[in-house]
């Protein structure tokens, strides 16, 4: 009986320690809680012309001025970093599925969080805030649909 009681106490203590020490620092929820910003949850289009994050009508994704990605043709593409031409005024943020503004950064939400940073107000740098793994860019942003 004492062994069973001791085992039960150890099990409960272990569960308490595990739940208290759990690190969720990489979760979307924590990222959004850390940022003060403006939220929008509207349409699925970001940007204008040839520079955009996601256009639901064509499924073209993340078209960069440096030519790393020209369009999305259904194949997995591991690239996540690049530059998007344009300035803040060129992008209609009211049409972004989910976003937050913080300084010169835009955090785009959806399936996973992406961080977009303005550089000299004429380029956008896309920064991956999660580990890439083997996910395609399409898999990472299709949560906008």
Identify the residue ranges that each predicted region occupies.
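Residue-level recognition of alpha-helix boundary/capping or hinge positions
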Residues: 4-8, 12, 19-21, 48, ...
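Bacterial Sec-dependent N-terminal signal peptides
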Residues: 5, 13-38, 42, 143-145
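Short hydrophobic/aromatic-rich beta-strand segments that constitute the beta-sheet cores
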Residues: 41, 69-74, 106-109, 122-128
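N-terminal glycine/threonine-rich, aromatic-flanked beta-hairpin/loop signature
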Residues: 51-107
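Edge beta-strand at a domain terminus
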Residues: 81-96, 127-145
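Short, surface-exposed loop motifs enriched in S/T, G, D/E and P with embedded aromatic residues
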Residues: 96-99, 113-117, 138
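Short, exposed beta-strand-loop hairpins at the edges of beta-sheets
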Residues: 113-117, 121-134
């Amino acid at each position: 009986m004492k062994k069973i009681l001791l085992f039960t106490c150890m099990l409960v203590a272990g569960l308490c320690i595990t739940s208290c020490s759990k690190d969720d620092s990489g979760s979307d929820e924590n990222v959004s809680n850390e940022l003060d910003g403006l939220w929008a949850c509207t349409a699925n289009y970001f940007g204008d012309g040839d520079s955009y994050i996601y256009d639901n009508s064509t499924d073209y994704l993340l078209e960069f001025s440096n030519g790393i990605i020209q369009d999305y043709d259904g194949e997995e593409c591991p690239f996540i970093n690049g530059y998007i031409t344009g300035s803040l005024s060129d992008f209609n943020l009211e049409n972004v599925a989910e976003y937050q503004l913080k300084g010169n950064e835009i955090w785009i939400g959806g399936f996973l969080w992406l961080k977009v940073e303005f550089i000299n107000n004429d380029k956008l740098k896309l920064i991956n805030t999660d580990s890439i793994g083997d996910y395609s860019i399409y898999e990472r942003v299709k949560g906008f649909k």
